[in-house]
Amino acid sequence: MDVIVKMLILRKFVEQGNVCPIHLCVDIYKRAFPRSVNKGRSSYARRRRALELGRCHRCYRVYPPLFPEISRCDNRTCVPGISYNSKVRDYILWGVTEVIPHPGYNF
């Protein structure tokens, strides 16, 4: 509620031809978009979600690999390939997708 009042005051202030004070803009921005810590983006959370899908948390490939002798994923020094499933990547990194992943969706 406090942010709405400040924004209305700021709008009236600018409409009258005054210069907008930068410290007030910064204060409104900080209160309107509060920074919450991590939101489940820690390395532990990424590894947990990747394990849940059966994927590597670094390169998003299937891990453990089906054919270990030809796999490029060692789960330690691997990097994502040219094309990878962006839905899998988004779920592992951010934890939220448009559709909650289910083992039957053939990721």
Swiss-Prot record:
One of its GO terms (molecular function) is DNA binding. InterPro entries: Carla-bd. Keywords: DNA-binding, Host-virus interaction, Inhibition of host innate immune response by virus, Metal-binding, Suppressor of RNA silencing, Viral immunoevasion, Zinc, Zinc-finger. The keyword Zinc-finger applies. Residues 46-49 are annotated as: Basic. A zinc finger (C4-type) spans 56-78. It holds the Pfam family Carla_C4. GO terms for biological process: regulation of DNA-templated transcription; symbiont-mediated suppression of host innate immune response. Suppressor of viral-induced RNA silencing. The potential mechanism of action is based on sequestering siRNAs. Belongs to the carlaviruses nucleic acid-binding protein family. This is RNA silencing suppressor. It comes from Chrysanthemum virus B. The lineage of its organism: Viruses, Riboviria, Orthornavirae, Kitrinoviricota, Alsuviricetes.
